[in-house]
């Protein structure tokens, strides 16, 4: 306490007074002191020593004891207030990243207050149903959030030993995902898309339809009130933001949704903190309120480009395509904040959306994302051009946690075998289609023609479905069997004989 009081005197602030240790109001006073100490840090000193402005960065000289990641409040000559964060410290110099941009900052007249605290965001269960900007300020004309807690936006590190392996399948109602790339609760799986493709519609459909597989009471959590969606938009246009907002309102789920919107005309630098604000809110809802949270992050390509802009302003050595060398680590600090924790009922499932520049899956953003996440859902332009919705190409798509989320007791015992056989038949069908373009249909064998028929029916009946068509995983598997009956039993080599004898002869007239 004495040390803190001395530090306050050195920094120009009033020293903290000791709290009396007796009496009925001791608990309340101690709590008030804890709150003021941790969250309402008073500015230490005000500086007018801005020596330069470079892009989103402000450089200050003659700063006493600047600290890394410290929050700085800037006051412009016209009284406008902005906030920033210390990115780099060298002696008495500090490089500050300004979240709202640096336009209008006068080097001689701008004053900077160092708060002595890190960036924290107020969190509360009341944030559900609200809309915030990319800095976490309400933009829905509602009141300021009455905070239950103030949390560091970088999150708390989770002990790997305390993580629980995701094993409960989330039913999205989309056959291409549920049947062949099943998502587990607590998984991180991105949607790899490109400009002009319906990735927003797919994400909205997942939000509308997501729920646990309805199997039996000992497996399924039937309660819907503990489900929440946190949606973070980075660099999207107003049309996309309005699409998601109106979709949530129309299906009646807006009360369970928290939106963070950084639009294309908002400051680029703000995109660095938007996903972290969203994930901090999601962690509070999951681990404190014990809700099952689905986090949608769009567009991660805009986030990575904002990261590149800051890196270029700091004159760091660029990596591939000009992106910083630490982009892999930076993306991991976002994606790894998904999962389940022992002793908590809640979970965080992440579905980041990224648009691949020039449809290039080898671009650094999708390339590094694929290394970190547990699979990907690939949205294909060729399928989209043929009017197939959702245009999900199952061949490059993958779910690494599918094996533990399906099977007897979770979905159905034939799930894995049907998925493997559908993959094999579709891959062979694609090869036959390519061969047909070279040699013509007359040169194909009878088996080849069967694969070609399967290919067309698979895309038309299995992949294609309506945007409001919600298929159960059992309906999806039945459609899969209906397609596999195109082939004689002998050609279905990926399915064990016992499974074939049980499911293959079923009457498919009801489908």
Swiss-Prot record:
A cellular component annotation (GO) from this entry: plasma membrane
Q: Which GO terms describe its molecular function?
A: ATP binding; proton-transporting ATPase activity, rotational mechanism
The domain of life is: Eukaryota
Q: Which residues cross the membrane?
A: none
The protein's matches in Pfam families, at most eight in alphabetical order, are given as:
ATP-synt_ab, ATP-synt_ab_N, ATP-synt_VA_C
User: Which positions make up the signal peptide?
Assistant: none
Q: Where in the cell is it found?
A: Apical cell membrane; Melanosome; Cytoplasm; Cytoplasmic vesicle, Secretory vesicle, Synaptic vesicle membrane
Residues bound to ATP: 400
Instruction: Fetch the CDD domains from UniProt.
Output: ATP-synt_V_A-type_beta_C, ATP-synt_V_A-type_beta_N, V_A-ATPase_B
State where it is primarily located: membrane
Q: Which Gene Ontology BP annotations are present?
A: ATP metabolic process; synaptic vesicle lumen acidification; vacuolar acidification
InterPro entries per UniProt: ATP-synt_VA_C (IPR055190), ATPase_a/bsu_AS (IPR020003), ATPase_F1/V1/A1_a/bsu_N (IPR004100), ATPase_F1/V1/A1_a/bsu_nucl-bd (IPR000194), ATPase_V1-cplx_bsu (IPR005723), P-loop_NTPase (IPR027417), V-ATPase_su_B/beta (IPR022879)
Q: Fetch the PROSITE patterns from UniProt.
A: ATPASE_ALPHA_BETA
Sorted alphabetically, which keywords does the UniProt record give? ATP-binding, Cell membrane, Cytoplasm, Cytoplasmic vesicle, Hydrogen ion transport, Ion transport, Membrane, Nucleotide-binding, Synapse, Transport
Q: How does it sit in the membrane?
A: Peripheral membrane protein
Q: What biological function has been recorded for the protein in this entry? A: Non-catalytic subunit of the V1 complex of vacuolar(H+)-ATPase (V-ATPase), a multisubunit enzyme composed of a peripheral complex (V1) that hydrolyzes ATP and a membrane integral complex (V0) that translocates protons. V-ATPase is responsible for acidifying and maintaining the pH of intracellular compartments and in some cell types, is targeted to the plasma membrane, where it is responsible for acidifying the extracellular environment.
* Assembly with partners or alone: V-ATPase is a heteromultimeric enzyme made up of two complexes: the ATP-hydrolytic V1 complex and the proton translocation V0 complex. The V1 complex consists of three catalytic AB heterodimers that form a heterohexamer, three peripheral stalks each consisting of EG heterodimers, one central rotor including subunits D and F, and the regulatory subunits C and H. The proton translocation complex V0 consists of the proton transport subunit a, a ring of proteolipid subunits c9c'', rotary subunit d, subunits e and f, and the accessory subunits ATP6AP1/Ac45 and ATP6AP2/PRR.
Which family is it part of?
A: Belongs to the ATPase alpha/beta chains family.
- Would you tell me the protein name for this molecule? V-type proton ATPase subunit B, brain isoform
Question: Which species is listed as the source?
Answer: Pongo abelii (Sumatran orangutan)
């Amino acid at each position: 306490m004495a040390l803190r009081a001395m530090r306050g005197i050195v920094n120009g602030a009033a020293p903290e007074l000791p709290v009396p240790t007796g009496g009925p109001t001791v608990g309340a006073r101690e709590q008030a002191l804890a709150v003021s100490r941790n969250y309402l840090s008073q500015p230490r000193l005000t500086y007018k020593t801005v020596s330069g402005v470079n892009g989103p960065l402000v450089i200050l000289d003659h700063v006493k004891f600047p600290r890394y990641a410290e929050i700085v409040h800037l006051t412009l000559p016209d009284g406008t207030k902005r906030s920033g964060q210390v990115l780099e410290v060298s002696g008495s110099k500090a490089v500050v990243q300004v979240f709202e941009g640096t336009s209008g900052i006068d080097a001689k007249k701008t004053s900077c207050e160092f708060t002595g605290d890190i960036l924290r965001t107020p969190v509360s269960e009341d944030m559900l149903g609200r809309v915030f900007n990319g800095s976490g300020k309400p933009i829905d004309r509602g009141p300021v959030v009455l905070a239950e807690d103030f949390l560091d936006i970088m999150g708390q590190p989770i002990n790997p030993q305390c993580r629980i392996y995701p094993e409960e399948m989330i039913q999205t109602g989309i056959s291409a995902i549920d049947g062949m790339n099943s998502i587990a609760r607590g998984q991180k799986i991105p949607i790899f898309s490109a400009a002009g493709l319906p990735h927003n519609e797919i994400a909205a459909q997942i939000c509308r339809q997501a729920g646990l597989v309805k199997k039996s009471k000992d497996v399924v959590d039937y309660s819907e009130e503990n489900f929440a969606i946190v949606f973070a938009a980075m660099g999207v246009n107003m049309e996309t933001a309005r699409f998601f907002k109106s979709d949530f309102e129309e299906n009646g789920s807006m009360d369970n949704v928290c939106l963070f919107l950084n639009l294309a005309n908002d400051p680029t630098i703000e995109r660095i903190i938007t996903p972290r604000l969203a994930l901090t809110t999601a962690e509070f809802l999951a681990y404190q309120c014990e809700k099952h949270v689905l986090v949608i992050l769009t567009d991660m390509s805009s986030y990575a480009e904002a990261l590149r802009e800051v890196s270029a302003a700091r004159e760091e050595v660029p990596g591939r395509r000009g992106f910083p060398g630490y982009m892999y680590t930076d993306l991991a600090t976002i994606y790894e904040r998904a999962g389940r924790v022992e002793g908590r009922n809640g979970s965080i499932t992440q579905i980041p959306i990224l648009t691949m520049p020039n449809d290039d899956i080898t671009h650094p953003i999708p390339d590094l994302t694929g290394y970190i996440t547990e699979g990907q859902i690939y949205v294909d332009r060729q399928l989209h051009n043929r009017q197939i919705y959702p245009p999900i190409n199952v061949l490059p798509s993958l779910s690494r946690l599918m094996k533990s989320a399906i099977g007897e007791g979770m979905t159905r015992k034939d799930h894995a075998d049907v998925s493997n056989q559908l993959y094999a038949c579709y891959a062979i069908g694609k090869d036959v289609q390519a061969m047909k373009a070279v040699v013509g249909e007359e040169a194909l064998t009878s088996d080849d023609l069967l694969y070609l028929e399967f290919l067309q029916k698979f895309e038309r009946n299995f992949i294609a479905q309506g945007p409001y068509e919600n298929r159960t995983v059992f309906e999806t598997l039945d459609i899969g069997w209906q397609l596999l009956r195109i082939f004689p039993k002998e050609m279905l080599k990926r399915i064990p004989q016992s499974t074939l004898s049980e499911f293959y002869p079923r009457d498919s007239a009801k489908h």
